[in-house]
Amino acid sequence: MDTLKDQFVVPGDVIGKIGDLKVRIGPGLLQTKDTVLATKAGVLRYSKFHRFYWIENEQKRYVPQVEDMVIGTIIEKHAESFKVDIGSSCSALLSAYSFEGATKSNKPLLNVGNLIYCRVTVANRDMEPEVVCLSQKQKAEGFGQLIGGYMLNCSLGLSHYLLSEDCFLLQILGKHIPYEIAVGVNGRVWINSGSNHNTIVVSNTIYNSQYIQDDQIEPFILKSLSINETSGLVEQN
């Protein structure tokens, strides 16, 4: 895997064999058995802090793929559907019946500006994306409106890292702060905690994790918690 690190790769290039390596792969990479292939053109990057490989390119905008879990904002409300901003070039369509238990007489009470956690079901360059607030089992299972809290924008690579099963960062945060989190692969993270201060700490920790080593994360959290007053949430470009 290291032989192509910081090298330009194109779709179809064999990046290497994972074997027994304990690494994670992110945007632009696909694992087939124990082989990792490039699916987009760009520079292969590796974070030694997070043991995380991904392909970095000029893509700034999220490109929907079927089964992606994303965070969206309601931008239009219609009788039986909603338009949702998911950060892609086109808004997504959400049916009012794509919620657990939804019927003609029991539709979700969503308004423009509301946040939702949803799943992409249609992603075709010739059609607008479609999303649902249901799991593959047709249950809510965490999908639906995100009430309260704070939404943080981050890189697509960081959002994929946060979704990994053994994400060290979220484990350490959970030791010190009770919180809820929803992570979208479209580079959006929703956080809700018991207080504004704790929500700020979680947000700042996630944002700054891109620039500090794993062994610096816990001291960063403890220092942040010791501050009684903060000036506000992280600034974003």
Swiss-Prot record:
It comes from the Eukaryota. One of its GO terms (molecular function) is RNA binding. Component of the RNA exosome complex. The keyword Transcription regulation does not apply. It comes from Dictyostelium discoideum (Social amoeba). The gene is exosc3. It holds the Pfam family Rrp40_N. GO terms for cellular component: cytoplasmic exosome (RNase complex); nuclear exosome (RNase complex); nucleolus. Non-catalytic component of the RNA exosome complex which has 3'->5' exoribonuclease activity and participates in a multitude of cellular RNA processing and degradation events. Belongs to the RRP40 family. It is found in: Cytoplasm; Nucleus, Nucleolus; Nucleus. Its main location: cytoplasm. This is Putative exosome complex component rrp40. Keywords: Cytoplasm, Exosome, Nucleus, Phosphoprotein, RNA-binding, rRNA processing. Residues 67-137 form the S1 motif domain. The keyword Phosphoprotein applies. CDD domains: KH-I_Rrp40, S1_Rrp40. One of its GO terms (biological process) is nuclear polyadenylation-dependent rRNA catabolic process.
